[in-house]
């Protein structure tokens, strides 16, 4: 699945970062629905693009500060399948900030191809996830504090 426009985030509301995606044949399983692991790939892309909007290039963070983000916990619920050619929006909210980690809420919604709004505004998301992302020191693999400048960027976004 490719983003409809990877450089154009589509925020839904204050505090929500979102990107559009379309389901391609390569994203589906033999039953014609999105293969479960593909939702995780799309969520990772949204986290990466969200960090970019905060001024974080993960390669620079690793090279210059020796830090990297790792998923340390994941709780996911598959509510309803997405299918070939569906237009989706994957969003992200920051639910909790701790010294060395973030808990992010991520959801996948079916959206209208005409307006990119949800097909059914009252519907539950197709997929709901809670993702704990920890900051890790690349040299020793131990947890590291979230950099102050990153906390400031999150607060002002």
Q: Model-found features: residue ranges?
A:
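HotDog/MaoC-like acyl-thioester-processing domains
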Residues: 2-11, 19, 78-87, 95-157
């Amino acid at each position: 699945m490719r983003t409809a426009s990877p450089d154009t985030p589509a925020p839904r509301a204050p505090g929500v970062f979102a990107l559009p995606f379309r389901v391609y044949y390569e994203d589906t399983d033999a039953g014609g629905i999105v293969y479960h692991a593909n939702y995780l790939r799309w969520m990772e892309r949204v986290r990466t693009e969200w960090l970019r909007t905060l001024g974080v290039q993960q390669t620079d963070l690793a090279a210059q500060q020796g830090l990297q983000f790792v998923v340390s916990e994941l709780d996911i619920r598959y509510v309803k399948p997405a299918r070939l050619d569906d237009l989706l929006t994957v969003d992200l909210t920051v639910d909790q900030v701790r010294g060395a980690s973030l808990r992010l809420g991520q959801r996948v919604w079916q959206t209208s191809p005409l307006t990119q709004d949800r097909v059914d505004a009252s519907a539950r998301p197709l997929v709901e996830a809670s993702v704990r992302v920890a900051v890790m020191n690349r040299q020793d693999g131990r947890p590291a504090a979230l950099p102050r400048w990153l906390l400031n960027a999150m607060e002002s976004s």
